[in-house]
Curated annotation (Swiss-Prot):
UniProt motif Nuclear localization signal: location: 22-27
Biased composition (Low complexity): 49-60
Organism of this sequence: Xenopus tropicalis
Keywords tagged on the record: Nucleus
Name under which the protein is recorded: Akirin-1
CDD domains assigned: akirin-1 (cd22243)
Reported function: Molecular adapter that acts as a bridge between proteins, and which is involved skeletal muscle development. Functions as a signal transducer for MSTN during skeletal muscle regeneration and myogenesis.
Amino acid sequence: MACGATLKRSMEFEALMSPQSPKRRRCAPLPGSPATPSPQRCGIRPEMQQGQQQPLPQLGGDRRLTPEQILQNIKQEYTRYQRRRQLEGAFNQSEAGVSNEVQASCSSLTAPSSPGSLVKKDQPTFSLRQVGILCERLLKDHEDKIREEYEQILNIKLAEQYESFVKFTHDQIMRRYGARPASYVS
């Protein structure tokens, strides 16, 4: 059987990994310098200033939503959100009956501008959290549509490329073998 011996590392190895070690000195900040290391010495990219931010590329191209479409999408999303909250509320309640709160929200959904409505004029239609949820959902839907369009375009391009490959291969075979009949041997 093989026999092996191991030795315990000396304290010098631990000294190499300490902050005072020359191996770590290059990226460690000096006592009088700022806490972030210099990008030239440590190979990290400097963060961009707020004024120097590059604009994000437009994903939709010419497919921008009009304000009417945005409003319609927000209204649809809000009704989905309210239905979801109703279903969650109904699910959490016992099966025996429905509370007055859900009935009141149902009546406010059907007729929000009725005189008996509990919604005040000064009260905003959406809370900040609801607007955030709506925007996230709209962005997700828009991203999904863009992904679908992108996949369709890629599939079309791939099909065109395949067609040209098949045509090229067929032309090469015809040049090489001419009008001779194809055989299993060749």
